[in-house]
Amino acid sequence: MYISLIFFLSNHFPPLISIPIFIFLSFSSPTNYTHLKLKKMQPSGDPAPEKEKEMTQPKVSLLKLFSFADFYDCVLMTLGSVGACIHGASVPIFFIFFGKLINIIGLAYLFPKQASHRVAKYSLDFVYLSVAILFSSWLEVACWMHTGERQAAKMRRAYLRSMLSQDISLFDTEASTGEVISAITSDILVVQDALSEKVGNFLHYISRFIAGFAIGFTSVWQISLVTLSIVPLIALAGGIYAFVAIGLIARVRKSYIKAGEIAEEVIGNVRTVQAFTGEERAVRLYREALENTYKYGRKAGLTKGLGLGSMHCVLFLSWALLVWFTSVVVHKDIADGGKSFTTMLNVVIAGLSLGQAAPDISAFVRAKAAAYPIFKMIERNTVTKTSAKSGRKLGKVDGHIQFKDATFSYPSRPDVVIFDRLNLAIPAGKIVALVGGSGSGKSTVISLIERFYEPISGAVLLDGNNISELDIKWLRGQIGLVNQEPALFATTIRENILYGKDDATAEEITRAAKLSEAISFINNLPEGFETQVGERGIQLSGGQKQRIAISRAIVKNPSILLLDEATSALDAESEKSVQEALDRVMVGRTTVVVAHRLSTVRNADIIAVVHEGKIVEFGNHENLISNPDGAYSSLLRLQETASLQRNPSLNRTLSRPHSIKYSRELSRTRSSFCSERESVTRPDGADPSKKVKVTVGRLYSMIRPDWMYGVCGTICAFIAGSQMPLFALGVSQALVSYYSGWDETQKEIKKIAILFCCASVITLIVYTIEHICFGTMGERLTLRVRENMFRAILKNEIGWFDEVDNTSSMLASRLESDATLLKTIVVDRSTILLQNLGLVVTSFIIAFILNWRLTLVVLATYPLVISGHISEKLFMQGYGGDLNKAYLKANMLAGESVSNIRTVAAFCAEEKILELYSRELLEPSKSSFRRGQIAGLFYGVSQFFIFSSYGLALWYGSTLMDKGLAGFKSVMKTFMVLIVTALAMGETLALAPDLLKGNQMVASVFEILDRKTQIVGETSEELNNVEGTIELKGVHFSYPSRPDVVIFRDFDLIVRAGKSMALVGQSGSGKSSVISLILRFYDPTAGKVMIEGKDIKKLDLKALRKHIGLVQQEPALFATTIYENILYGNEGASQSEVVESAMLANAHSFITSLPEGYSTKVGERGVQMSGGQRQRIAIARAILKNPAILLLDEATSALDVESERVVQQALDRLMANRTTVVVAHRLSTIKNADTISVLHGGKIVEQGSHRKLVLNKSGPYFKLISLQQQQQP
């Protein structure tokens, strides 16, 4: 029908009228028909299935991806687009010259000398065209690379800015650190890829498509119209592929985020994981999360194969139609052979360009899906954004705070009411203490004052103004906060204190450090205030971190001070002086103090007793104790009784429970094992990493388990690639036949058309099989690499995790990016490489058979083509590593800021974080322009050589014909085949940047996989019938991250089997280092650590740790249920054993009071539980393990008085006949220990039982006891 219509139009209407008619018929009718057909297939009235919603909803428009382009970016994009369009249009222009040369070469039989002269002239025109291509391709690559980097940097900043301004409730229920790392590491990289080179490539191919058709219409419009009728079919195939791909990509991303969250959490709690030998369990959970990506990845491979196969199938069918229709055009004398042939070539190349644009369209589809959660977060409205626009700022702050009928439940648990119409008045300038049991709601008061949450009803007033109407940043600027678990950032001590006041002077910083009693330990550090504290302050002891946090609050000089167990992590000596400093700071300020230990709040102006979300008593210390039946008096008696039971000779209260953490500081809980490490900085001259050399053989050895998929995919890729030179051969054969008689032409064209139809079916089959095989192999590779990397990471010693490049955020980022890019290089790019390899091999075989002389000349030009791309590759290699490192540091900062979101919000540090983040992005942004310029120039040079070689080939072909060494037929066929080869080589070499990135990622992967942990069992000997004798003999020890700071020198310690040993002393004296050495988190530099008389270096590491139970000062829980967290102690335990452990740890009662009981999710790092609840779950976990050796690091520190008494009794029962090492600041908790060792400066300065040590009135133990006695009521 279409063919008849074309001839009818060509005979009765001029082109200007007939072309619009045909275009209308081509694009209206089929499209409408298809639309109706699709509508008919959709059942009316039925709600869309959930699966379809997932496919269609998570995407943004293509234009929205460019939301961050400014005027300079618009200029760059305009110039880059102009360059891409000129570059793309150059191929159709080349075929105009080529068509003229065909006619000239055809005249060579009649006028050989004139023909040679004219061929030389047109060959020179090819050189001029090559120069234009050089500059346009340079402009294309340089501009798009630079603007892509710029826009991605702005998107990263906007995403982090929005994330930091979110309501805190979002982080309790939806957002996680893993999700942020995934978005910044992976999703924005996907968007950046689409915004930079992919847009340039797309415009390049689309301009080639448009130019090809435009030139075709001006030459022989009938041929172009026939081809145009195929376009809707190609577009439909591409559209269906894109539609299905979006849903699959979104699902794969969701699975990757879940896996990333598991990895980030496990690495962050690596000490707990290794202590409980939970490495294999963590790997199993990680693998299970990745298995969904494997399932959806296989479907994505099938979809891609069918999509690309369908498009190429349609293209082959269109070539069959074109070859036949062109012969009819020539036969009817509508156009000559040369003109018809070049028109056909232009249209074919235009059609091919659509196929070549398919990967770019695929990149846009991925970018639209990846950008959806990014833009959703950026555009999400929050209280912070609203208050910045409409919130008021008070001219003066007196500090009067009032809770008026405040009702509140946490968004993550709306069915648990915390406050029901709470009324509380906090007078201006007064100190108000909140006391009560764990979980009573004390810390929630602080959360509401800080406006981390909004009350459901009622109001919180500041000086009579509802704080919900105030500017939230201004409000938080008036408040100073010290949390129970101090959140520090991975920078220097000075920078951490500056979070309190960004423009503080050196004198103000020093004064704050003096007031908080931090100046002494800071001055003892080799780098003083410039000491790096490590990720979340991991290089400092708990007491040191707390003092820096107090310094940060002091330097802020706030009108309102909120203290949540501010001195809980300090030793007795420091606590007294810090408490005195805080007493001075609190004068004249409205202060809210949350405390369990009543001795710290007896001087408060007002004490409010909180019980189950109600204020049950209110008054000062004297008034409250005057009521013997009151709640406060009961709490006081309970503490005194607990103290007297432990130590009747000293009438004091030494309990140190922390407050409830219902306000949930989302900081990474870390053990205090590193308490004596002063800095994470590497010693001078240390080599941070060794470059890993990766051979191609080793690279592909990673896919050896899937060799069957690889072989099958490779064969199909070869077949798919080899079809292109065969197509070129068929087309050139058609050209030659156009100059024969009509009968001969019909015979040849029929054969060629049938071959093309067969090729279309083969193409569909091989593309589908190829992408199914490579898709499956890619997902299996990604799963295997991620699993092996994760396992290898967890095998490393704890000292490795202390290094600045191995923080949890950075390692999670590497797992995310390295494996994905490895899949890209080994699988995605391999399909193109293998196809092009099949193409090149087939092309050269055919070309050498047809005309070896011409083939050799063309082959001689290839080194010039390749050299341009090699230069580009070498240049990119020089900068790739630095950029990857810069992004890793930026990702670490982003992850850290989100995990410490409450501290960031409380100190209004959002802008400071963004400034630091922008600083980390500065280097890649600066170098992007330079990289783009040089990469573009080298790319342009290689393109120049490719097109110049065409001119050389045609000139040499005419010379061979002139000398009678070749005929017209062989020259045309050879030239057509070699054109296809050159295009394929250009495409292959254009992959150099991607191959380079992949090579760097592979090196990064093998760097982790090949690293041998420095702590391994020298033999596989296991301990049986462990009684528990521990001995440290002649131990010398320094932390690997700071070898110049000696912790122990010739240290000796013996813990007898079944006995308890308590380690006491000031913060930083070496107590927690003993636990680290027993667990073999570190090895001594000299001396031995022995259990049962055996050097633990010679024992199997996991077997050793199975006999050791651990309860840390800061409990580390996992984002699963309470039941699963307790079960972590013994995976094979029964339900009754889990419940019994919880009962012994005094956790059963609060667990059963929760709506979901043991199935309650604890949240990321236990964020949904209070501090006391987290600690009891951790104790239950240790009880369930039933170890021979028990290590307690302030195990009851987070409990209220009543819970502590019961839990201490449970621990006493657990410690019976079990070797126990207890680390404690509060001496009341270790009175019953068989032996007490007093540590000072890494030495045991006194040792004995409590009864013996208190007799020595001048001894260090008695001094510590006396100091604590003075601090009690």
From Swiss-Prot:
Keyword field: ATP-binding, Glycoprotein, Membrane, Nucleotide-binding, Repeat, Signal, Transmembrane, Transmembrane helix, Transport
Alphabetical list of SUPFAM superfamilies matching this protein: ABC transporter transmembrane region, P-loop containing nucleoside triphosphate hydrolases
A GO term for molecular function: ATP binding
Domain ABC transmembrane type-1: 77-366, 710-997
Transmembrane segments: 66-86, 91-111, 126-146, 209-229, 230-250, 305-325, 345-365, 711-731, 752-772, 832-852, 934-954, 975-995
Record-listed ATP 2 binding positions: 1065-1072
SMART domains: AAA
Gene3D superfamilies registered for this protein in UniProt: ABC transporter type 1, transmembrane domain, P-loop containing nucleotide triphosphate hydrolases
Subunit structure, as described in the record: Interacts with 1-naphthylphthalamic acid (NPA).
Protein name in the entry: ABC transporter B family member 2
Organism: Arabidopsis thaliana
Lineage: Eukaryota, Viridiplantae, Streptophyta, Embryophyta, Tracheophyta
